[in-house]
């Protein structure tokens, strides 16, 4: 027994590595256990029972993906030649989660080849590593401590502190309404490990890679508040020698590293490059360019790993530097507070163990930076993981179901109840001879198009839906038109979504009736954290931020029980309210109440909260998730600008004008209203009658202004063409006259030359004759 104790003590010192302050706690054999989530999704959810200081703790974990199939590690062999390997084997190893029963806890594990990671409570952290020399899945647990607590945060120049003071002065004058809501953003990171750190972490490619991935896992866990997620693009390890001179002055080394990055690494503009180094007694913890995360030239940093610190502390250093580049400054005010004992952006955070959260000042800094400068360089989607699409089975065409489907000219119902027997053949769904239409609310029994302006679809929601009218050119009613998603309704307390004003109260009234209302948040949190058929967000229980988007929970003020056909009801007494949640029983008999009945959002029924329902200030529900309202609509129509504040935007991105204003731009016009899409005829002038609106969005047929358009465009064109023709005719005459004169002069010259030639030919002959006569004499 004594020998075993000595062995474990020695192993504890060995696995503690270069930090002599790591306190060995115990060895343990983690036991993988089964739960609701792990039974349904073995690949994405795991749970372990871990004994720590004599107590048993259940650790619940969910897979985290910050590697892609294209992530690569680069290193150098003994000859200095660069080699590369995919990081694919490490892709499915990273998990994060919490300790059950401890809301202020955090767990980050790598599960390949044993468990390796950190368990964080409020004021203490424990590291766990596998003991490879012992069999039976034995692990060692030790308490994280830091030996070196005197590392300067800023360095000698203290530049970040000065920047913070200047920024704080400027930001105090900015009203909080300029702060935007946070949305998920992804930082693609190119990580370089220099030779010093490579040697300090073990001088082994695989070991160093695992530790870097573990550090980034901790970084992502800390960035949850800011909705930032670091994705590892590549890891380059300078395993032979440093490519950049290490001067031990991070501020100077940063410029050298940035210059090396520009010359040797081809990165996209939204990639951030970081050099991770080691220094026993550094001047500071690192360097970066504050507020330049989106600047291609300056999106880089240097993080220094001081001797005697833990991997947890190194993760805090990286978080602080990345935060600086994203506009988050260090906390220097007593008014900054957070939910943990130590806030992330403080010097104490680097050396303290346990949980750390961003302070109120940090959150304001980040939101201000995002609203003022934007984070468009950062992707808003994670890596596209390959999945197989689940195509729904193709629906078979059915003639006689009163629905006109592909391949049918009309469908008036069955032979017995056909609504347009004169117009449509109910057996073949073909229009009869001479019929203009065969079915539809705008088709008369005489097979003619209904007159324009006849109501064909009445609004079902006074705030969010619009009436539609026959346009006089089709037997069908025009496409459904309704308010743009995100338009306020219910006196500003809810959002319009797909033509309905979505509120918890209305949904409860429709589901169970009586004086039921939407339950308070405490009820939703209590019920939807169950993870069963009565409370869930589909495949699993709802996390607290999404609790209002799972199963519908209502208050029930009546003494009698809820009695509804095909509904099973559960009651919960939360504080002063009786809350009820329901599940449908008509589809199948519930045999296992620990399992949810719906796996896909498309399969939800009325017992779930509807999409578009408010789940927080400026937030709405979408497929079990509570999202920022900025994502609720992607249209370009702005009611204040495009509709001049006299209408609202519809789902087709056009203005629906209030009464007394005419579309499309809602100009004042007595008696007018609506949009270009609702089918009714829009009056344009007192004398010219009406302008007919085509069913196709944005296409307008101008029946009265067409001739005016032709007149105003055609007349100038005709004048220009006529002028050209006249000009060409005059030029032609001039050309012909010039040609005639030229020919005349040519002919005169020719005749003159002929006469002259004849005269000249006569004189030599006479001269010769006279000479002969003189010779004879």
Curated annotation (Swiss-Prot):
Detected in testis. The chain crosses the membrane at residues 707-727. GO terms for cellular component: plasma membrane. Residues 763-777 have a biased composition (Basic and acidic residues). Residues 396-485 form the Disintegrin domain. It is found in: Membrane. Residues 17-142 form a propeptide. The keyword Cell division does not apply. Residues 185-382 form the Peptidase M12B domain. Glycans are attached at residues 49, 123, 566. Disulfide bonds join 294-377, 336-361, 338-343, 456-477, 637-649, 643-655, 657-666. The keyword Signal applies. Subject to proteolytic processing during epididymal transit of spermatozoa. It is a single-pass type I membrane protein. One of its GO terms (molecular function) is metalloendopeptidase activity. This is a non catalytic metalloprotease-like protein. May play a role in sperm-egg fusion. This is Disintegrin and metalloproteinase domain-containing protein 5.
